[in-house]
Design a protein with these regions (language model features):
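Right-handed parallel beta-helix/beta-spiral solenoid domain characteristic of secreted/periplasmic
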Residues: 44, 79-137, 462
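Glycine-rich beta-solenoid repeat tracts in large extracellular/virion proteins
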Residues: 53, 72-75, 89, 105-112, ...
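N-terminal extracellular ligand-recognition/capping segment immediately after the signal peptide
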Residues: 44-50, 61-81, 85-87, 96
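Bacterial N-terminal signal peptides
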Residues: 14-25
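Solenoid scaffold repeats with emphasis on beta-solenoid/beta-helix
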Residues: 40, 62, 73, 80, ...
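Right-handed parallel beta-helix/beta-solenoid
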Residues: 29-51, 55, 65-68
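Right-handed parallel beta-helix
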Residues: 118-226, 232, 236-241, 250-251
């Protein structure tokens, strides 16, 4: 009798649990159906994605089931949502593949699509770019440039699509291996842009004459034959582009491994710019005739070749570098930052630390540049030759309120080294525990001028072998 009651109790418990499980399953299925209710489904309704787009109208949703779709797609000006079954599930994204098979761009927005044209939750691969003739300023003149643009995605003609939660990988083009944006304003967010190649500029992303928003993307392991392994920016649209909250790492290029910026003034904030390698100039940033705002970024462990391990500022550029961490970068000259050729940046409240170079471990300033350097922590930088903290030549920087500490040069100028017609204005700086063969704090070479207050309001302590060495 007891056994029978026990069996009955177990049966009732099992039945209740089964009912609960079925209820939860039905609820989950109901929620999933609700998400895609009224959607066009591929391959159920149409065998290809492009056929579904052709049949869609503004406001429609197209849901694509996992699979490899070997095709190129064009939104044709339609403000529709194209999505996988679950853009938040990385496994679904990896298994829902649009593959161009090495022909043209994978995805095209070229007909004035708005922000309501959305692509989300796909792996986009196998693109080789569209042949386009676009205009660029070259040597002061607008010229038509035929090229293969936008291996993975191409955005043209004042289009403003939303590109989110995709993996864009293994695409190639002459410009914009992963994404090419020209005269448009897309929102590009939460994507992984990886292993793309540009033989020219913009291995990951190329923005030209555009007002794009790039946020929270992983841009990694892309390559450019010339400039902008991660991101290349040329010109700008109605408003500056915004680059915020991205991780830009392990990219490679001749110049500007992470960023190459030409005649543009984007706002670049809250990014991680880490472990990028330039064969020539600018492991992290290469700026040419540009004045971007670069704020609150982590610019670390980049390699700059001859110049500018972290940031290379060239040719009349006047950026604002504010509140950044510039740490552990390496170059032949200007391990952390190089400022050259008539440039006038505002460099303030940054941590410039643990950078290495032959000349100018922390900063190198030269060729008639006039930077304002205020409130920075310039510490523990190393120079194999001169100017562990800062190397200055033929320029007129103003340094105010900086802490220049614990830098070491194997030769001269532990804190600052000045050379060849440099005129250096110093006020309210702290020079502490810097080391060199001569000029522990400051080395002033023949022909250089040091302008100090009367009395000198800089602070010197513990510099070896001396504070100021004047030739």
């Amino acid at each position: 009798m007891k056994n029978r009651k026990r069996k009955q109790s177990l049966y009732l418990i099992s039945t209740v649990l089964l009912i609960i499980a079925m209820t939860l399953t039905l609820t989950a299925c109901g929620d999933a159906e609700e998400v895609v209710e009224g959607a066009i489904t591929v391959p159920d309704d149409y065998s290809t994605i492009q056929e579904a787009i052709d049949a869609a109208e503004d406001g429609d949703v197209i849901v694509v089931r996992p699979g490899r779709y070997t095709e190129r797609i064009d939104f044709q000006g339609k403000n529709i949502t194209l999505r996988s079954t679950d853009p938040a599930d990385s496994e679904v994204v990896s298994e829902t593949i649009i593959d161009a098979g090495g022909v043209d761009s994978v995805v095209s927005f070229r007909s004035g699509e708005s922000e309501n044209a959305v692509i989300t939750g796909f792996t986009i691969t196998g693109g080789s770019g569209n042949m386009e003739i676009l205009e660029f300023e070259i040597e002061g003149e607008m010229r038509e440039v035929p090229s293969l643009y936008g291996g993975g995605i191409i955005v043209l003609n004042d289009s403003s699509p939303t590109i989110s939660s995709n993996v864009i990988k293994d695409n190639v083009a002459e410009r914009g291996g992963g994404i090419l944006v020209y005269a448009s304003s897309p929102t590009i967010q939460d994507n992984t842009i990886i292993d793309n190649l540009s033989t020219g500029g913009g291995g990951g992303v190329f923005l030209a004459d555009s007002s794009a928003s790039l946020s929270d993307n992983e841009i990694t392991n892309n390559s450019a034959g010339r400039s902008g392994g991660g991101i290349a920016i040329s010109g700008e649209g109605v408003s500056p582009s915004s680059i915020d909250g991205n991780r830009i790492s392990n990219n490679r290029a001749e110049n500007g491994a992470a960023f190459s910026i030409f005649q543009s003034n984007p706002v670049i904030s809250n990014n991680q710019v880490i472990n990028n390698t330039a064969a020539n100039i600018g492991g992290g940033f290469y700026l040419v005739s540009s004045s971007p705002e670069i704020r609150n970024n982590d610019i670390s462990d980049n390699q700059g070749g001859p110049s500018g391990g972290g940031v290379a500022i060239y040719f009349e550029s006047s950026p604002e570098l504010v509140d950044n961490l510039i740490i552990g970068n390496d170059a032949d000259a200007g391990g952390g930052i190089s400022v050259l050729v008539d440039s006038a940046p505002q460099i303030s409240n940054n941590t410039i630390s643990d950078n290495r170079a032959r000349l100018g471990g922390g900063l190198l300033i030269g060729e008639n540049s006039t930077p304002q350097i205020t409130g920075n922590d310039i510490t523990e930088n190393y120079a194999e030759r001169n100017g562990a903290g800062i190397f200055i030549q033929e320029s007129e920087p103003v340094l105010d309120g900086n802490s220049i500490r614990n830098n070491e040069a194997r030769r001269d100028g532990g804190g600052i080294y000045t050379l060849l017609n440099a005129i250096v204005t110093l006020s309210n700086n702290i020079f502490e525990n810097n080391r060199a063969s001569q000029g522990g704090a400051i080395h002033v070479s023949e022909g250089a001028v040091l302008e100090l207050g009367d009395p000198d309001d800089n602070t010197y302590q513990g510099n070896v072998p001396d504070d100021v060495h004047q030739e």
